[in-house]
């Protein structure tokens, strides 16, 4: 804390501390006597003898004589601040030289002010305009990620609001009929209400959408592996947190949660790669003379033995083939989570198809999807006589209680087909992932969801306190975005 003092001259004018003047005398009164004893002027005089009052700010004319009838006043000649802290240097020989020098020189001669080191200027060989552009780009990337995280939470909230509306609709009695309403009638009424406000997303009815269990992966800005995300999603659903899921997971109350089944390190490390339009061109494959050829390099497709290679047939009849890397590159990588016509595994040697089967944990293809892919190969004159089509994928097959194994295609047919008919997931476009699914809900639910995550806050009277995000609704512990929804039999807003 800096203290600055001046003093009054004999003509009652204020003299600044940077000028020299004669020491005024103040009449000795009981008040002055009390102040002199209280402030302990003798201690200040001792400090003057030890530190040579150059920059200390204590300066006397004739000394302070408390016994005399008219003691001289003490003059604080400089302001006391952090920058005026001093240390004594070269006290020996310089004292004699300074005794004969001027008062101004004595004040500056033997003491060196302690000052903070000057900041080192940042230097870069790049021009300042380029550095400014880089800073703006970094800010845009961070803001984009924050916005996409909020939109992902918005998608979760609007899904919950949708199920809440359906729950209220099925419990609402029929006002036009006095007879008790049957369960079938209630479900039919809920489906009718859903059909009025819902709309389809894809023109191709045979297209297979991304499985619901990987929905969180698609809308996650980091595209963390959907299976891992659902483990944390279950913890969030069972908690009493009022924060949206992704906010809770990354920076909210759940940022310290670390599960044994999936550690936080594994969750952050296993992020699925989502290809853009230019990136996926390296994986596009065409059929020439019945053989699989890379469209970009014109080389025959050769799947390395001991590794797993996967394929995806888009709704525009484009084939993509690449090597599977668990937790990094999977079926959803090719089209950034968009709908597909067929997906599965493939084995090819020198461009000749040796084996193909429809196993995909992300898309859960059905027999109909597999037939579409077989028709695609036949249309391009691929010889399927010796092609193996009934292999078992060790990652996706299930073991029943009796010990027998069934391929995941049969599981998809029994459990996933109804799920896929009810849910369509247009999570992305050709330019990359986006949250377009929010537009498939009624406008009032969209508005409420945006308000919940504070992306479009409602104007209210008074100031809004900054206490984190608005609570996310949970109509029922059983109603949430998880694989359990596939067994509920409720209609989807997008079907």
From Swiss-Prot:
Its main location: cytoplasm. Keywords: Cytoplasm, Nucleus. It is found in: Cytoplasm; Nucleus. Induction: Down-regulated by salt stress and treatment with mannitol. Residues 89-122 are annotated as: Disordered. Residues 131-160 form the IQ domain. The keyword Cytoplasm applies. It comes from the Eukaryota. Signal peptide: none annotated. One of its GO terms (cellular component) is nucleus. Expressed in roots, rosette and cauline leaves, and at lower levels in stems, flowers and siliques. InterPro entries: IQM. May be involved in biotic and abiotic stress responses. This is IQ domain-containing protein IQM5. It comes from Arabidopsis thaliana (Mouse-ear cress).
